[in-house]
Amino acid sequence: MYALTHGRIYTGHDVLDDHAIVVANGLIERICPLADLPAGIEQRNLGGAIIAPGFIDVQLNGCGGVQFNDTAEAVSVETLEIMQKANEKSGCTSYLPTLITTSDDLMKQGVAVMRDYLSNHPHQALGLHLEGPWLNIVKKGTHNPSFVRKPDAALVDYLCQNADVITKITLAPEMVAPETIRQLTDAGIVVSAGHSNATFAEAKTGFRAGIRFATHLFNAMPYISGREPGLVGAIFDEPDLYCGIIVDGLHVDYANVRNAKRIKGDKLCLVTDATAPAGANIEEFIFAGKTIYYRNGLCVD
């Protein structure tokens, strides 16, 4: 047990001076005034540094020059360790490694790797995010169309049986039966709507079945029109639904970001959806079987 002292503590609600953070067995036990520290406890003086909660990124394909995607070699514990170190340099302490649309075999390898990683690093990655493969092909984005498919019972059962290491699955609600969505949510997996061409009614059916999140708001979704609100309109009409949004000025116009924040409030969260160049000095990489080039802050194929 030890105490972090002489730092300015940002709790998310208050800014605390003359307080300490007591750490026991690798976890924060409590925050207390300096005067209330136990006698004799080891104190680590931070010299006025800021102490704040780390960022949590719920959609991260890769960073630090590596990707948790594409090949059996890349979907590894070592890749996750590199990603964690790169994240920490920018203040991100926890994340969901995101494995995009791929084969059943590589998905199962991703699950096994996630289990192995969590057994040795319990407070870093927060479980696996499977982005696909049950997407709408017309909104596939960079995902490999040869792997986009409908659910089959065997794979659904496997994912549910491993829900302790699978935190989130992104799917297109119009492509997946409500019963399957309900099965996944009943297993404890957060189901997210994304890469979808759903109508307002189709999206609402998915929400009623248990969808609680939406993946990268506005991107790989149909436009809102006067007569058809579509998936985006359904998200805005669902006050308890959370959604991620990429705020780099390229994926989503800032006016749309502002409007989304006004409508969704604290249900809107930032995601990076980052790839290998984040936190690394590289000019190209492989993603979804394609060579991607990093040019002037933008990834292009």
Each predicted region: which residue ranges?
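Charged helix-capping and loop-helix junction motifs
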Residues: E78, G110-V113, D152-A153, R227-V232
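N-terminal metal-binding scaffold of metallo-dependent hydrolase/deaminase domains
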Residues: M1-L37
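Divalent metal-dependent hydrolysis catalytic cores, especially in the metallo-beta-lactamase
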Residues: N61-G64, E81-G110, H123-N136, A163-E174, ...
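Active-site glycine- and acidic-residue-rich loops that bind
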Residues: S103-Q109, E174-A177, V190-N197, I246-R258, ...
